[in-house]
Amino acid sequence: MSRDLRDFVPIEDGKVKMYVCGPTVYNYIHVGNARSTVAFDTIRRYFEYRSYEVAYISNFTDVDDKIINRAKEEGITPQEVADKYIAAFREDVTALGVQPATRHPRVVEFMDDIIRFVEDLIEKGYAYESQGDVYFRVEKSHNYAKLANKTLEDLELGASGRTDEETARKENPVDFALWKAAKPGEISWESPWGPGRPGWHIECSVMSTEILGDTIDIHGGGADLEFPHHTNEIAQSEAKTGKTFANYWMHNGFVNIDNVKMSKSLGNFITVHDALKTIDGQVLRFFFATQHYSKPINFTEKAVRDAEINLKYLKNTYEQPFTGTVDVKELQAFQDKFVAAMDEDFNTANGITVVFEMARWINSGNYNVEVKYAFASMLEVFGIVFVEEVLDKEIEALIQKRQKARANRDFATADKIREQLETQGIKLLDTKEGTRWQRLHKLK
């Protein structure tokens, strides 16, 4: 499978179908997990900036060994564990300015579909039952590891460390589980092979194809999912449908601490829940955007502080009065340059460079309402939006002043006040009942 940059050609003109692997909901997400969520939210936002209609699906894995183990530790049900950490996830990513997905499917909602999917693979000869488990025949899948650029020999070597009991149930050590027989005391569902639950990989294949169809435009996730998760998704999905599963694969880089990957297994992680106690959500999000999504980023106190300083500069730029005239061609040149930067594999680092160039241009005296909204639109691609520090009582006072000016036929002053409020994102509506106002953007 090519790792070269390719022009994006959607399945359907003007529309994008994206599936991004979401969290296994057994704990709070850490900063590394958040990078993936933010990266793909930014990619989605950029497609929308370019006027695409985006169907964005990101799942919750709510059936997993880790959830079962956490339920035992906390003395609650796996369902209660999943509900608890889904709520925590939503709270954390909202603080990071992440938009809700078009749909957040949960595995438990698709159990019948998963069973039918596995049955179909068995009928086609791609899967087999063994002692209540069902496994996928890797040898039958042509170009099985094309995504990860691995050979079957590599996989067989990697499988050598598995237990004899596990290997004994398989035709080949590299075969992977589609369905797992239930263990005593574990949550399970009835199936043609006895009570059990789905394997990890089958879940995303089923949710993606059921919601978005057999072939999607983009499938994304963290770099650690390339193998085996995404590799296995491709194998089982294409075996079932006979079609390409995803036309484009995108993987975000890791967040490192002291140049070592942040992970729960290494114990060097910081949860978003804790990070937000000392770091503003927009600052953390802006920090992520300073590096290309596919490259590692080092999480340091200095890097976060620099992000905070730079974000403050952009906020100060945005909050000045945007009155005056500008050269429309110069404004268009910045917009074109921004698109060129982001079109190159969603290069947020280069996109932000253009935003700062535009900020310096604005601060040199080039500002009006059109510039303000163009600037705000670029920032919103990165999920950066600012609160307008305009108090309701101040707006009302200006409206009263404008009404007096109109009554005195001082239309120049009335127009000036209208323009002043528009630069602050406030639109005036003159009605028979009087003047009302509304915000042009809800900035947060």
PLM feature spans:
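Alpha-helical recognition segments enriched in aromatics with Gly/Pro capping
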Residues: 1-24, 41, 112-320
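Short, polar/flexible loop-turn hinges at active-site or ligand-entry regions and domain interfaces
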Residues: 74-80, 101, 294-298
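Structural preference for alpha-helix termini/caps and helix-kink/transition segments
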Residues: 261-444
